[in-house]
Amino acid sequence: MKADSKTWTIAEAGAELARSGKEFVTLFKQGTLEVEIYRPVGVDRQKPHKKDELYVIINGTGTFVHGGQRTAFHEGDTLFVRAGIPHRFEDFSPDFATWVFFYGPEGGE
């Protein structure tokens, strides 16, 4: 069933993540959109994804490595990665957490 609306607070999403015991948890799916909260511990081990991806930084600072580039980030920044592009977070602070939005068809738009 399609949702008419959905809301989360950062605290609610963080609590769900803590309960999961994982570095990420999927909070919502509808159509091609998937919303997650992601909080790696120590090292970011993610691999390229099949869909386009948007990050919105919740907390923390660090370096975003993507497509041969290195970009400093901090709370409130928005980062885009096309499907299939290797990327990772490095040198991130212990409080680092980000929203993740996957969307579109596999292979990207």
Give the residues covered by each predicted segment.
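Ligand-binding loop in jelly-roll beta-barrel domains
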Residues: 84-109
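Short acidic-glycine-tyrosine-enriched beta hairpin
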Residues: 68-83
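Histidine-centered metal-chelating micro-motifs
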Residues: 43-44, 79, 83-88
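Short hydrophobic/aromatic-rich beta-strand segments that constitute the beta-sheet cores
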Residues: 35-37, 64, 98
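A short, N-terminal "cap"/entry segment at the start of jelly-roll beta-barrel domains
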Residues: 1-37, 42-47
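Short strand-coil-strand connectors
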Residues: 29-31, 65-69, 92
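Short, conserved beta-strand element in jelly-roll/cupin
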Residues: 49-64
